[in-house]
């Protein structure tokens, strides 16, 4: 079987190519700049990303530490310096790329795409003289749709197989939270920081 670190690297590697693929679709097919699906600001706000990353890391580590103190028997120390170093290098480089990619796809590209779709649906219904769906409903549909898709894409995760499909509620809820943050802040920088931190802490602390 493949080494776990090598397997992690191979699983994350497609994210790099997918990022270029997303750029190609946005730039060449939609004739838009990548920044247009990232933020309403002129450029990516790294301060927001950094703030989100640090805040979520502090919260996650605090909860994880508290969980260990309350249920110490549920955890086992499994530390190998060399393997951890390799894991750290892979994670610190690849996981932020993968997390930002997911935010760009779900909270950027798809959120905007579904907004256009549901807006057109609203206009069609209005023209035909049918019952008009109220605007707030139209606005939240892209949020719920992208969150459900985001949650379902985690259905093959190992923890789902062990704990059960009920855990999908957590992923859908996380998608909703990231989506709300994106809508309120008018950009994916904060949610990308939260997402990268969440995945990085899980990779380094839980699986290490």
Per-range role (PLM):
Residues 2-5, 10-12, 34-101, 111-131, ...:
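Juxtamembrane helix-loop-helix connectors linking adjacent transmembrane helices
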Residues 16-17, 58, 197-202:
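Membrane-embedded alpha-helical segments of transport systems
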Residues 16-33:
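Membrane-water interface of transmembrane alpha-helices
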Residues 22, 63-64, 107, 202:
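Alpha-helical transmembrane segments and their lipid-water interface positions
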Residues 24, 28, 61, 65-69, ...:
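Hydrophobic membrane-targeting alpha-helices
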Residues 30-34, 71-75, 106-107, 158-161:
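Perimembrane helix-loop junctions in membrane proteins
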Residues 88-208:
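Transmembrane helix-loop-helix hairpins at the membrane interface
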């Amino acid at each position: 079987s493949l080494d776990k670190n090598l397997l992690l690297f191979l699983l994350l590697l497609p994210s790099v190519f997918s990022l270029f693929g997303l750029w190609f679709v946005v730039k060449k097919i939609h004739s838009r700049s990548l920044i247009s699906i990232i933020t309403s600001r002129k450029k990516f706000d790294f301060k927001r990303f950094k703030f989100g990353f640090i805040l979520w890391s502090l919260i996650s580590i605090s909860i994880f530490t508290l969980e260990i103190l309350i249920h110490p028997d549920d955890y086992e120390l499994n530390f190998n310096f060399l393997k951890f170093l390799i894991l750290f290098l892979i994670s610190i480089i690849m996981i932020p790329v993968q997390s930002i990619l997911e935010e760009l796809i779900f909270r950027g590209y798809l959120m905007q795409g579904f907004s256009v779709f549901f807006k057109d649906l609203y206009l069609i219904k209005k023209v035909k003289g049918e019952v008009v769906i109220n605007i707030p409903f139209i606005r939240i549909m892209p949020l719920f749709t992208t969150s459900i898709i985001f949650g379902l894409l985690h259905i093959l995760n190992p923890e789902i197989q062990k704990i059960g499909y009920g855990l999908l509620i957590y992923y859908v809820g996380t998608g909703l939270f990231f989506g709300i943050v994106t809508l309120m802040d008018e950009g994916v920088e904060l949610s990308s920081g939260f997402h990268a931190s969440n995945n990085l802490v899980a990779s380094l602390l839980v699986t290490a």
